[in-house]
Amino acid sequence: PWWRDDLFYAHGDAYFDNAHGSLLAMAIENTSVPAEILKGTFTGDTLVGMGSVNKQRNLALITNQTSTGTFYFTYIFPGYYSSSADKRIAANVLYRVAMPSTSGIANGSVVRSARSKNIVYYTNDNAVYAHNVLANSNFPTAALFTVGSSSEKIVDMVFSDDDNLIYVATNDTSASMPGSLYCYDTQTNALRWSKQHITGRIVKALFRNK
Protein backbone atom coordinates (compact mmCIF):
# COMPACT_ATOMS: atom_id res chain seq x y z
CA PRO A 1 0.00 0.00 0.00
CA TRP A 2 0.97 3.66 -0.33
CA TRP A 3 -0.18 6.94 1.18
CA ARG A 4 -0.76 10.39 -0.26
CA ASP A 5 1.08 13.39 1.25
CA ASP A 6 -1.99 14.89 2.88
CA LEU A 7 -3.51 11.60 4.02
CA PHE A 8 -2.88 9.65 7.20
CA TYR A 9 -4.21 6.35 5.96
CA ALA A 10 -3.33 4.03 3.11
CA HIS A 11 -4.59 5.39 -0.20
CA GLY A 12 -4.05 2.48 -2.56
CA ASP A 13 -2.67 -1.00 -3.19
CA ALA A 14 -0.30 -2.04 -5.97
CA TYR A 15 0.07 -5.45 -7.61
CA PHE A 16 2.50 -6.83 -10.17
CA ASP A 17 1.40 -9.20 -12.93
CA ASN A 18 4.35 -11.41 -13.92
CA ALA A 19 2.43 -13.01 -16.77
CA HIS A 20 2.04 -9.70 -18.59
CA GLY A 21 4.85 -7.59 -17.13
CA SER A 22 2.51 -4.94 -15.76
CA LEU A 23 1.95 -2.92 -12.59
CA LEU A 24 -1.64 -2.63 -11.36
CA ALA A 25 -3.03 -0.16 -8.85
CA MET A 26 -6.32 0.40 -7.09
CA ALA A 27 -7.54 2.94 -4.55
CA ILE A 28 -8.45 1.39 -1.19
CA GLU A 29 -12.06 2.60 -1.35
CA ASN A 30 -12.48 1.38 -4.93
CA THR A 31 -14.12 -2.01 -5.48
CA SER A 32 -13.45 -2.17 -9.23
CA VAL A 33 -10.80 -4.33 -10.91
CA PRO A 34 -7.23 -2.94 -10.45
CA ALA A 35 -6.06 -0.98 -13.49
CA GLU A 36 -2.64 -1.02 -15.13
CA ILE A 37 -0.50 2.06 -14.54
CA LEU A 38 2.67 3.16 -16.34
CA LYS A 39 1.76 0.90 -19.24
CA GLY A 40 4.76 -0.45 -21.13
CA THR A 41 7.29 0.36 -18.41
CA PHE A 42 7.63 -3.23 -17.22
CA THR A 43 6.99 -5.13 -20.46
CA GLY A 44 8.94 -8.40 -20.38
CA ASP A 45 9.77 -8.03 -16.68
CA THR A 46 9.08 -10.34 -13.76
CA LEU A 47 9.01 -9.03 -10.21
CA VAL A 48 11.83 -9.74 -7.77
CA GLY A 49 10.28 -7.55 -5.08
CA MET A 50 8.71 -4.17 -4.34
CA GLY A 51 7.78 -1.96 -1.42
CA SER A 52 6.78 1.52 -0.33
CA VAL A 53 9.34 4.12 0.78
CA ASN A 54 9.49 7.81 1.69
CA LYS A 55 6.86 7.44 4.42
CA GLN A 56 4.90 5.20 2.05
CA ARG A 57 4.45 8.00 -0.50
CA ASN A 58 6.37 6.28 -3.33
CA LEU A 59 7.03 2.74 -4.56
CA ALA A 60 10.29 1.01 -5.44
CA LEU A 61 10.39 -2.11 -7.60
CA ILE A 62 13.17 -4.50 -8.55
CA THR A 63 12.36 -6.50 -11.67
CA ASN A 64 14.18 -8.86 -13.99
CA GLN A 65 13.84 -8.60 -17.75
CA THR A 66 13.63 -12.23 -18.74
CA SER A 67 14.89 -11.83 -22.32
CA THR A 68 18.19 -10.23 -21.28
CA GLY A 69 18.58 -11.21 -17.62
CA THR A 70 18.97 -7.53 -16.72
CA PHE A 71 17.72 -6.37 -13.34
CA TYR A 72 16.02 -2.98 -13.14
CA PHE A 73 15.37 -0.70 -10.20
CA THR A 74 12.31 1.47 -10.80
CA TYR A 75 11.30 4.28 -8.46
CA ILE A 76 7.81 5.63 -9.02
CA PHE A 77 5.10 7.91 -7.75
CA PRO A 78 2.07 5.59 -7.97
CA GLY A 79 -0.55 8.32 -8.44
CA TYR A 80 -3.65 9.53 -6.67
CA TYR A 81 -7.02 8.08 -7.61
CA SER A 82 -9.80 10.37 -6.42
CA SER A 83 -13.46 10.03 -7.31
CA SER A 84 -13.19 13.67 -8.39
CA ALA A 85 -11.48 13.91 -11.77
CA ASP A 86 -9.93 17.29 -10.98
CA LYS A 87 -8.12 15.83 -7.96
CA ARG A 88 -6.57 12.83 -9.69
CA ILE A 89 -2.80 12.76 -10.10
CA ALA A 90 -1.25 10.45 -12.69
CA ALA A 91 1.47 7.97 -11.80
CA ASN A 92 4.95 8.71 -13.10
CA VAL A 93 8.38 7.10 -13.17
CA LEU A 94 10.91 9.03 -11.09
CA TYR A 95 13.72 6.89 -12.49
CA ARG A 96 14.35 3.43 -13.92
CA VAL A 97 17.92 2.14 -14.13
CA ALA A 98 19.67 -1.16 -14.77
CA MET A 99 21.33 -2.66 -11.72
CA PRO A 100 24.97 -3.70 -12.28
CA SER A 101 26.19 -7.20 -11.48
CA THR A 102 28.24 -5.71 -8.63
CA SER A 103 25.04 -4.67 -6.85
CA GLY A 104 24.47 -8.18 -5.49
CA ILE A 105 20.94 -8.54 -6.82
CA ALA A 106 19.83 -11.99 -8.00
CA ASN A 107 16.73 -13.94 -8.86
CA GLY A 108 15.37 -15.19 -5.58
CA SER A 109 16.59 -12.15 -3.64
CA VAL A 110 14.34 -11.15 -0.77
CA VAL A 111 13.37 -7.49 -1.22
CA ARG A 112 11.97 -5.40 1.63
CA SER A 113 11.60 -1.66 2.18
CA ALA A 114 11.92 0.50 5.26
CA ARG A 115 8.61 2.25 4.71
CA SER A 116 9.33 5.39 6.74
CA LYS A 117 12.76 5.83 5.18
CA ASN A 118 14.18 5.89 1.66
CA ILE A 119 15.95 2.54 1.82
CA VAL A 120 15.31 -0.72 0.00
CA TYR A 121 17.01 -3.84 1.40
CA TYR A 122 17.66 -6.96 -0.67
CA THR A 123 19.54 -10.21 -0.13
CA ASN A 124 21.96 -12.57 -1.80
CA ASP A 125 22.28 -15.86 0.11
CA ASN A 126 23.26 -14.69 3.65
CA ALA A 127 24.22 -11.14 2.65
CA VAL A 128 22.06 -8.03 3.01
CA TYR A 129 22.44 -5.05 0.67
CA ALA A 130 20.79 -1.62 0.99
CA HIS A 131 20.00 0.97 -1.67
CA ASN A 132 18.92 4.52 -0.85
CA VAL A 133 16.43 5.57 -3.51
CA LEU A 134 17.85 9.12 -3.37
CA ALA A 135 21.16 7.74 -4.68
CA ASN A 136 19.60 7.05 -8.08
CA SER A 137 21.96 4.69 -10.00
CA ASN A 138 24.68 4.57 -7.32
CA PHE A 139 24.11 1.03 -6.10
CA PRO A 140 26.11 -0.66 -3.34
CA THR A 141 29.03 -2.84 -4.41
CA ALA A 142 29.41 -4.59 -1.06
CA ALA A 143 26.98 -6.09 1.42
CA LEU A 144 25.75 -3.96 4.29
CA PHE A 145 26.23 -6.97 6.56
CA THR A 146 26.26 -10.76 6.38
CA VAL A 147 24.06 -12.93 8.55
CA GLY A 148 25.16 -16.07 10.36
CA SER A 149 27.35 -18.53 8.47
CA SER A 150 27.86 -19.03 4.73
CA SER A 151 25.66 -22.14 4.83
CA GLU A 152 22.63 -20.04 5.80
CA LYS A 153 20.26 -18.42 3.32
CA ILE A 154 18.01 -15.49 4.13
CA VAL A 155 14.35 -16.36 3.54
CA ASP A 156 12.61 -13.29 4.95
CA MET A 157 13.14 -9.88 6.56
CA VAL A 158 10.71 -7.78 8.56
CA PHE A 159 10.97 -4.39 10.28
CA SER A 160 9.87 -3.09 13.65
CA ASP A 161 7.08 -0.50 13.59
CA ASP A 162 9.55 2.39 13.65
CA ASP A 163 11.89 0.77 11.08
CA ASN A 164 14.79 0.99 13.56
CA LEU A 165 15.18 -2.79 13.78
CA ILE A 166 15.28 -5.39 11.03
CA TYR A 167 14.60 -9.04 11.84
CA VAL A 168 16.25 -11.50 9.47
CA ALA A 169 15.15 -15.14 9.18
CA THR A 170 17.49 -17.75 7.69
CA ASN A 171 17.50 -21.45 6.90
CA ASP A 172 20.57 -23.68 7.06
CA THR A 173 19.99 -26.93 5.18
CA SER A 174 23.04 -28.51 6.83
CA ALA A 175 21.50 -28.23 10.32
CA SER A 176 18.92 -30.51 11.92
CA MET A 177 17.15 -27.36 13.15
CA PRO A 178 17.63 -25.11 10.11
CA GLY A 179 15.73 -21.99 11.17
CA SER A 180 17.49 -19.02 12.79
CA LEU A 181 16.48 -15.45 13.62
CA TYR A 182 18.69 -12.36 13.83
CA CYS A 183 17.95 -8.79 14.85
CA TYR A 184 19.95 -5.83 13.47
CA ASP A 185 19.90 -2.13 14.27
CA THR A 186 19.14 -0.23 11.04
CA GLN A 187 20.90 2.90 12.34
CA THR A 188 24.25 1.22 13.04
CA ASN A 189 23.81 -2.07 11.10
CA ALA A 190 25.02 -3.83 14.25
CA LEU A 191 23.71 -7.20 15.39
CA ARG A 192 21.47 -6.79 18.44
CA TRP A 193 20.83 -10.46 19.13
CA SER A 194 20.56 -13.84 17.45
CA LYS A 195 18.67 -17.07 18.05
CA GLN A 196 20.38 -19.74 15.99
CA HIS A 197 18.93 -23.11 14.98
CA ILE A 198 15.82 -22.72 17.09
CA THR A 199 13.18 -24.14 14.76
CA GLY A 200 12.43 -26.10 11.61
CA ARG A 201 12.48 -24.60 8.14
CA ILE A 202 11.24 -21.01 8.17
CA VAL A 203 8.83 -20.02 5.41
CA LYS A 204 7.88 -16.49 6.49
CA ALA A 205 8.63 -14.08 9.33
CA LEU A 206 6.06 -11.75 10.93
CA PHE A 207 6.50 -8.90 13.39
CA ARG A 208 3.99 -8.23 16.15
CA ASN A 209 4.39 -5.37 18.58
CA LYS A 210 3.71 -6.32 22.18
Model-identified regions with their sequence ranges:
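Repeated scaffold domains used in trafficking and secretory/extracellular systems
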Residues: 1-4, 10-14, 43-59, 99, ...
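A short beta-strand motif characteristic of beta-propeller blades
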Residues: 33-41, 90-103, 139-148, 190-196
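Intrinsically disordered, low-complexity segments enriched in Gly and acidic/Ser/Thr residues
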Residues: 124-125, 129, 133-134, 139-172, ...
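Structural motif
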Residues: 16-26, 67-77, 126-132, 175-182
